[in-house]
Structure formats: C-alpha cells, structure tokens
Amino acid sequence: MIIPKDKKWVQVNGSEVMGNLWASFNIDLSDNYGRLRIGQRLIVNTDETDDADIGVPVAFASINSINYCIAGSKVFKSGANTPNSNFTEDAISGVPTNLNSLYSDMASFNGYLYVSANSTSVYKTDGVSWSSFSAGSNTGSPRLFVQYADRMYMTDGNAKIISWSTSDTPATSGAYTLDLSSNADTRRITCMRASASRIWIFTTNLSGGKALVYEWDGASTQPTRSYRLESSGAFSCVIKDDIPWIIDANANLLAWNGGTFQYITGFNRENHKLLTGIFSTTNDRFVHPNGMSIVEGNIHILINGSNNDNTGTIEDTIPSGIYEYQKEFGLVHKYSFGLTKSNGTIVDFGQIRISKAGALSELNQPSTSSTRNGTFLAGAQIYTNAGSTRNVISYDDQNSTLQKAGTFITTKIQSSEVTEMWQKLYVGVKKFLNDNDKMIVKYRIEEVDSTQISCTWTSTNSFTTTSDISAYANNDEITVIQGVGSGKCAHITDLSESAGTYTVTVDETFTGATSQTFLAKIDKWKKIGSLSNRNASYLECPIGKSANWIQLKIWVTFTGRKEEIETLYLVSAPNQFAK
C-alpha cells in the first residue's frame, strides 16, 4: 500500500478513516504539492523579556513603511516594514496609553492609522504625529473597525455601529449607523468585514440560540438582509475573492455561497467539546476577530485549541497555532508559537497548548535588506512552564534559518480482510541536510486515550510527576505540550515510583530542561524505527502485528526548506479471511 495514493495528502477532519491525515502539527503541504514538509518555525520578534508592557498582540497594521501593533495598553511599532524588525513602544507625543487587548482594534483609513481604546476617544497617526477625537458613548465592550467606501465604521457598545467620514466627524444616529440593540444578548457584534459592495456583521447569541450574520449597505438604518447560522456565533472572518469565510462557535470553517454560509470543513473536535471562550463578551475567544488572514493567497487561521472545560484540556487533533486551508488538502496545522528568538537556543519545537490567541496579519512587504525574514506577524500569550505566561509577537522563518519539527498521524488504515498482518513500513525521505535532523516512526493497533500530566524536569532526559501513570511502562510515548520541550516526543526507558511520585527517564535529550515545570501527555504509541543518517533515502520499520486496522505516526526534525517526506510504503497480507 502506498501512502498517499495519487501523491495527494488530505486532512478531512471529522473522520478517522477518510483522507490520509488524521492529525497534524507544523506540517506544510503547500510548499511542494504531493510531498510533506515541515512548516517554518515561528520566531519570537519581541516579547515581555524585551518590554514588560507588552500585552496580548491583537492587531497589526502598516503605514508609511512602519509596522504597528496593539499589545495591551500600548502601541508598539517596528523600525522597518519587515516582519522580523523588532518592535518598541511608540513614544511620539499624543500616543494612546489606555488601550486594552480585550477591546481595542486598529485599521487604516484616509492615509492614517486609527486605534480604538477602552474609552470614547479614537486615536490616529500618520506615522509622524498622533491626534484624537471623540466617537461614541460606550466603553467596556469591543470597539471594532471596518473601512468601507469613504467611511470608517466602529462598534459602539455591544450591538451598535457608528461611523465617520474623512473629516472625522462621527455619525452616531441616523444614516451611516446601525443599531441592533433591541435584543443585545442575541445580537452581540463579534466581527465586521467589508467586501466590494457590502459590510458583513457577525454576531454571537449569548442566550444559547442560533446567531445571525447581517449584510449592510453602510448607509441605511436597517440591515439589508440577515442570515441564520447553525451555531451560536461567528467570531472571525477573512474576505477571499470577495467572499467572506468565517470561523463559527463550533470551530467550523464556513463560506458564503450566495444564499447562506456553507460548511467547508472544521477543526477535528474528537470529543465534540466547544473550544475556549465562546461565551466571552470580549475578544478573548479561541479565535480573535483579527485571527484570520490571507497569507500567500491561502486562508490561515490562528487558534487556541484548548477546550472550554475546567482544565483547558487539548485534543491530539487540535493543537494550538496557525492552520492553513486549501481545497486540495483540507485544514492542516502549519505553524506553532515557540519560545525561541532568532539568535537564541532552541528549547522547544512549538507550544501545543497556549493561553490566548491574538492577531494574524500578512505583512509581506518588499525590502532590500539582507536580513529580511518573514511573511506575516502573529500574536499570542504562550506558556513558559506549567503555569507562567509570556506575550509574544512572532514571525515565520521563511529563510529557514532554524531547525523545526513536526508530527503527523495517518487515518486508520483498514485491513483488506477481517484482520491483516502488518509486516513492515518503508518511509521514503529526501536526504537530510543536517546531522541533527531526525525522523521517528511509530504505530498503534488499538486506541487508548492519552493522559495529560503535570511534570517537573530533573535533567535534560528525566522528570518527575505526581500524576498517576501506573498504567504506563517502558517504550510508551511522552509528548511535551506546554513549556520547555513542547512539540517534542520521546519514549520511556525507565519508570519508577516512590510515595506517589514517579520518576521517568526518556530516550531523547530536551535542550534547556533543568528544573522547570511543564505539561505533557502520555500515550501508547509504539516506536518501530528512527533515522538520522544523512545519506539514507528511506527507513525500513518492522511491525509484525496482526489487527483489523493500523495507524501510523511520524515525528521529524528538519533544518532546510526542501527536506520532505516523500512516500510511505506499508507492506501487509491478509491474516484472517471472511468465509
């Protein structure tokens, strides 16, 4: 059996058997169609270790060759228009200092950059100076922007929209305003976007019913039309080819088809739990209103994959980070936030679990700088250990300067008869470019739910935990999901227990691990082979097990852009025939 058949990798989501990818983490299927590469590492541009005032980055924009960001109460700007140019606080006279990541927004209009605060003031800059004016009367709720025709529109309160023209004179009632507040809890505005001929207004229903999407001409006092969603809300939107694409409360990707919002695909919620923050009255949800962007022509979505439960559990199929959608291969996890800066030591391969999701924006500006790097900026609040957080502004390492890692899990491969003897697996790869590059191959023939555990590093290859892991043993798998080592897998070589504390030794080295706390999950995946030989073009992995299905998992570290997994060859023969 050859995987993928017809050289086409596909992640359907919502099925264990359709397509050939069940789960992905840092996987790039668009860089070389038909081959599987690793998504470029997200490098930290600026974080709280550079400036303690940085909050969650929730908006990015560019004006006059300067990139701007709202992160907490302050405006930050870069020294150049490239994504890897570092951010510092804007210190020009009049710059606002009363912003809030839960409420504020940023957008360009009429040659200026407009910024909303948690007040009735609106601020604007041309990159040289700042000024402000009063608009609206409500505070304590998101003040979201959308520019349409020759006006800027802003939410004022939970269910009202005001606007102003190039003269910055606000219209607060009548023409060019909209008031949906007759039943505000069922029409709470979450996002606005403009296409060529209309404004799209997205809402959430906090009363538990279905939400509505409104179409508006920007001038009338009533919406042009309304459309009912099959969920309680829509939280983020991007316009592609003049069509709105949205993420709804069920973590589904929907697109306008001319008559309704049609289901395209969704995040693979194995346990059907809702994701974090869907009942929030601010912008603190699993996806931010500014969390979708068109990057190099494709839809990208930044999410917090944590479930909306007491402990914020995370499923194997929904790691946090940035996903890419294409019709050809579906919705795939491509990038994850990490702790590493461009000149720093690599101590993780991406945080599977994050605290808060922020903004995502393509800012692929032309530059002749020899150090230019990145095509987009992304913001989040991530974890540095089992509990501490750090706000980060990150960019994608399109120069492929740093090592990265990724994982994929195939769908269940069914036997051709009642049971199959799964004999061996060959994995074809492009020859490695670096001595530190590596591939580890695993399988399972029975499904056991993973266990999330809280741990403390004691060395670079050992840790302790008071979580009950008595059901696990040598050769079982550990994946760090939060803190130092996140995104890396290892297998147990020694496990002992004393007075309720387990001491675990693993077969991989976790650089930077000393005595930090971290979160991990433990599984029953069985390791069947590893490859680190730069001259090898394939790996042979013996299996020798009989079952009615098999699932494969591969974890790799690559350094260069063009390293890739080419093809899987699964060798098997029927074992038990149906008679």
Kindly label every feature range from the protein language model.
Residues D50-A52, G94-N98, S134-T139, S173-D185, ...:
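Surface-exposed ligand/attachment interfaces on beta-rich extracellular proteins
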